[in-house]
Design a protein with these regions (language model features):
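Acidic interaction surfaces
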Residues: 1-183
Length: 183
């Protein structure tokens, strides 16, 4: 029997887990993952850190593990994303995930390699767009520069060329998240 205990989450795993976790293989890797999280909590507590900020990771883990059709790859992807951080950056990662959608934070990590400060993600994130051209058009429109331009001239603007100029300061992910490099 394995019991995973945290102030916000308690999961007790008995010898017969088939009703909760399905196959024996899933039971095995679920146990391994819960042991990994328990180890991380012990590390945090050994450093006299307040582990309450770790709650969102624990909740996400419990949610992932209790999903019937979650795959090992999905759990491992989650593990890879959060465990790449040392304890100094894990709190910023959690804070950023609380402020923004997890997918946005993960896209930022894919672009920058880490979350040094939660504010860096919040400041860099510009929104989600279909293309860099859409982002460029929105930026110009937000500045009010198109208000006095006749519609027929506006249609002649080459937004692709303008978007290319934005690539010096901004990047767009495959999911359309735009980040400012200069923040």
């Amino acid at each position: 029997m394995f019991t995973f205990i945290h102030p916000e989450t308690t999961i007790t795993m008995t010898d017969d887990l088939s009703s909760v976790f399905g196959t024996e293989e899933k039971q095995n890797w679920t146990t391994e993952w819960l042991e990994h999280v328990q180890y991380m909590i012990a590390l945090i507590e050994d450093q006299d850190e307040d582990p309450t900020w770790f709650t969102s990771v624990i909740r996400t883990t419990a949610h992932l593990l209790l999903e019937e059709d979650v795959t090992r790859e999905e759990v491992e992807a989650f593990v890879d994303r959060y465990s790449a951080y040392d304890l100094d950056h894990l709190e910023d990662y959690i804070e950023a995930c609380n402020e923004l959608d997890d997918d946005v934070v993960h896209a930022y990590i894919d672009e920058q390699g880490h979350v040094a400060y939660a504010e860096s993600v919040l400041d860099a994130y510009q929104g989600q767009y279909e293309s860099m051209e859409d982002f460029a058009r929105q930026m110009v429109d937000d500045c009010g520069d198109l208000q006095d331009v006749p519609h027929f001239i506006e249609n002649a603007i080459d937004w692709e060329v303008i978007a290319e100029q934005f690539h010096w300061d901004y990047s767009i992910t495959i999911d359309g998240y735009v980040f400012n490099h200069n923040v």
